[in-house]
Each structure stands twice: as C-alpha cells, then as structure tokens.
Amino acid sequence: MNRREFTRLTSLAALILPRQKDWGLITDVNQLHPNAVKKQCIAAFKRFEQVWNFNDFWKRGNTFDACLVFADALHKKWPADKDVIAVLKSIDSMLEENYRYFKSFDAGKMWADDFGWWGLMAINARKHLLRSGNEVLADKYTKLSIELCWQQEKEHAYDFSDTAKPVPHGCRNGDADGQDKGVKNTVTNVLFFLLSCRIYRLLSTEKQTGNEQYLEMAYHQWLWFDSWFKLTGYGYLQQLGNDAVLVMERPTAFFDGSDYKNTTHPTWEKGWLWTGDQGMLMAALTELLNIKNDIAAWIMRNHADTGFNSAVFENSINHYIKSLAKGVNLGLIGNTDNIIREAPFKANFGPEFGNDYLAGRGILMRYMGQLGNKAGGVNFKKCITATAAAIWHTQDVVTNQFSPEFTSNESDELYAQQYRKLTGLGDPAMKWQIQAMNEQQKFGVCQSIGLDAFGALINQL
C-alpha cells in the first residue's frame, strides 16, 4: 500500500470506525461502529433524494430498486430510529411519483430487459408499501410487476420456438414493437429468470392461485442456462480455476446455422463479462433452490420433464452458486485493497454503453447483501466493507455525492494485471468514459451504487 492509499484509508477510519481503529488493519466487520454507519447511510439517502428523479427508464427502475433494498436493510437494523423512519416515509411519496413515471411510457418502445428491472423493483415496492400501510399502491405495483413487466417479457422477448441452435428458447433483448429483435444476452435472461422466481414466491406466500405459469417459466429459464453451462466448449462460463467461474455477458457460438453469433447491441468483446450479471445469477439460482420442491411436484404432476432427477437438480444449482461465488471472489475483487471492481473490458467502460454498465458493481453488492454473510460458501464481509469505505471516502464532502471512481489509478492497474494474469483476457485499466452522460442520471446512478454498498454493509453489522 502506497502512502497516498494509506492516508486515504486511515482518514476514512475516523469516519466509519471508532477513532482508535486503523481501517488498513481491520479484518473483522464487527469492529465497525454501527452508529457511524447509520449516520453515513442517512447522509447518502438525503443526497439520493435530490438526484433520483431523472428521466431514463431502465436506470430509474434499477436505481430505485437499490434504494428499496437499502431501506429494507435500514429498517431491519434500526426499526425504531427516527431518522430511519423519516427515510421510509420519504420513500412512500417517491413511490407514488415513480408509479406515475412508469405509466407515462409507451411499453412498446421499451427494451425487454427494462421490464425486468422494473418488475423486480415493483416486488420490493410492494413489500415496502404494505409495511407502511398503503395497500392500494402496493397492489398497483404488484399488477405492474406481473401484468405489465413479466407479461411484456414473456410475450415480446421469450423465444417459444424449438429451432434456435445450439440451445433453444431464452429471451431476446429486443423492443416490444419488434423493430429490433436484439440479442439473447445474460442480463435479459437472468432478469426474467429471477423475476419469474420472485413472482411465484410472492403469490405462493400470499396463497394466491394461478401461479404455476411463473414456476414453469422459472424452470424453462433454468434449462436455458443449464444447457449453456453444460456446453463447456463455448465458454459461456469463464473458468478461473479451482472450480471458480464467471458468466459471460452473452453466450456465443460461431458456426453455420448458429443463432448465437450476434456481436452487436452492444458491441461484443471476447471474454466480456459484467459484475451485475454475477449477482443476479447467484440470486436467481438461490431463489430456485427455495422453490425446488414445488418445481419437482409440478414436473411430476404435468409429466413436464421425463429425465428430471430432483437430487441432480439440487446438486447442480448448489454447484453453480458456489462456483460463481468463488469466481467473484477470485476475479472481481482487487487483491491489494479488497475492493469490488468491474472487469477490465472496454465494452464495460467505453463511451458506447459505459453509462449502462456503470451500475454493475452496485447490483452485485445488492445481491451479495441479500444472499447473506456467506453467499455460496464465500465470506464477502471484507470486500463489502472495503468497497463501502472507498465509496464513502471519495464522495463530495459538501453534497455527499458518490463518485463513479472510488479507487486509485495505481490499484486499478494492479487489478487489471491481476485479471489478465488470471484469465488471459481484458484490457488495461481505464476510467469510466461517461462524459456524455446526463449529469443528473450520473448522480443518481452513482448514488445508487453507494446505497447498494451500504445496504450490503448494514447486513454485515
């Protein structure tokens, strides 16, 4: 650690830890000072209140999901705290405005994955609104999640044909009007996978009927991913060694007749992967484990899969979760500072879609926090703590605005070298090329990354 980094980290110690502690020596998250963390969380939210109301459909859904998951963690940790209660009340009115925003759009003009982000957010909105006693708006968000978001993906993105090679079905990230068919990338498919699981669990918990179609689609999405993962020759799962893997941005197969040759929308780069996909896939697989018995019973009732074996099914899910967790730990966390990073690919950072992929680190931490202290058998406490610390220390001290960059140039290059040595792929270290990004969108997304990090941190206290 160089002098600059040491100064940065020890300065942060005075903010987030008891004054006598040295951040650079902290290995146990229990040494964090909860009241200091709570104050930082409140400050982070107050800034989010100022920047969240921007105009961008998918980013709006994702950033508010970050806010809701963060607020849920706050509530669980400090349910009676007056400042936390004030945060929850503010979110009530923000959800009213967000619902009006969603309804103002023509659904036919939106991309398929946009509805996945909003569908997941709507389920968390329902939970929040029921807790605050607003059943009317909670039911509107349930309808939004199921009848608008899930149905849109099913009708306009899912490939019902059996002809796609080498793997049939899956979802295309096209627009609902069909002007652009899009590509069957990971984010579109994992969003539909996770959303199907969560809608099924929601309806089952509330004893509602007519929920088998969500169970069926969750299983079909599992088959799509599992089929690809078994085709090891195509490298959809990046093998990092020691049973550690990361999932690529999209599955590709370059042969005559393949339906997976698309290298545009956005421009593909060999080995390219995104942090957000890793967190969502671990979450979807974990949700699948929670409904494994229901799936087995549904298959038996409907004779849906003659080769189904419940033990093999469960073991496969657990294997993928553990392998992905190991992959994140090995490939997406800097060895020198324990900070969670985006994989070093121009496709992530570049001007074409850097403003979209910017949010990935937060999305990964969001699901890390929800999955618990040892997701997939890996303890992520240290990296969540270090990342939240770095985000806090690099904020604007006047506005409490978080930055897209919260690591040093030197440590970024060390990480890029670490990644290339591990995989043989990737580019030199680079900064986020988001100069053309609307400023308020940038502020909102960056603040949501911080909320994701602090939400995960709260769950470690």
Predicted regions and their residues:
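Inter-helical turn/loop segments and adjacent helix faces that build the functional surface
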Residues: S132-G133, I199-E212, L288-I299
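Aromatic- and glycine-enriched pocket-lining scaffold segments that form the walls
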Residues: T142-K143, L148-W228
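Active-site cradle of extracellular carbohydrate-active enzymes
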Residues: S196, N211-L288, A325
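CBM-like carbohydrate-recognition segments
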Residues: W23-D113, W117, L137, E155-P168, ...
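The core hydrophobic/aromatic register in alpha-helical repeat solenoids, strongest
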Residues: C67-F70, M121-A125, S196-I199, L285-L288, ...
